[in-house]
Regions:
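Phosphate/NTP-binding elements of NTP-utilizing enzymes
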Residues: 1-213
Length: 213
């Protein structure tokens, strides 16, 4: 008997993670749950790979990362800790996340300084680029060809999440404006988050009253 679990993410993200894709992503402001949702789904993806006997690396990248404190490490840790079945699968240390079966490990990198070294990271199963708005087109041009692993019923994917600020940003032009059916991007905002924090709601109401423009 195969056990099933319920993974809670905003309803608007469900179609993004269904079916096949080369690129999946979400753009929106704070409180939209995009970062925590993608952190959780990266851990879920690693769990699925590992239990299928597939070994490799889940890479979490940002344009700027001078140290692990600037990375998505803590987001992924918290997402795993929220789900007992994920916590049972992963071993979490101060500076690492890896599966207890030895098949899956998370890596963290800054694209501005380490983009060349990513090509030698080994078997990349997935790359999630968070805070992707400042990522350059050159970085994407280097990164995408490294996601070439594939097997029966799967291929390596690129995930992107960002707070949209410039229509000219590389992430907007490459993915948000893409017509490919293998690129799945959604706009996500605070209204789409069923767990929108009460503190952010108070801040939002204050802004509406005191800073209506």
């Amino acid at each position: 008997m195969v056990a099933t679990v319920r993974v809670e993410i905003p309803d608007k993200l469900i179609p993004i993670f269904e079916g096949e894709a080369d690129v999946r992503g979400a753009k929106g402001g704070r409180g939209s749950a995009k970062t925590r949702s993608f952190a959780k789904m990266a851990a879920v993806k690693g769990y699925i790979f590992g239990n299928a006997g597939i070994s490799g690396i889940i890479l979490c990248a940002r344009q700027f990362m001078n140290s692990l404190e600037d990375s998505s490490l803590e987001e992924v840790k918290r997402a795993i800790e929220d789900e007992p079945w994920l916590l049972a699968y992963y071993e979490i240390g101060d500076k690492y996340i890896k599966s207890r079966d030895g098949r899956i490990s998370f890596a963290f990198a800054g694209l501005d300084r380490n983009i060349a070294s990513i090509k030698s990271k080994g078997r990349l199963l997935l790359c999630w680029v968070d805070e992707a708005e400042p990522v350059t087109d050159e970085a994407f041009t280097t990164l995408i060809p490294t996601l070439r692993e594939e097997g029966e019923g799967w291929s390596a994917e690129l995930w992107v999440t960002w707070n949209p600020k410039r229509k000219t940003a590389a992430v907007e032009k490459r993915f948000s404006q893409s017509k490919s059916d293998r690129v799945k991007i959604v706009d996500l905002n605070w209204r789409d988050n069923p767990k929108f924090p009460a503190k952010l709601e108070r801040d939002r109401q204050t802004d509406l009253i005191e800073r209506p423009d």
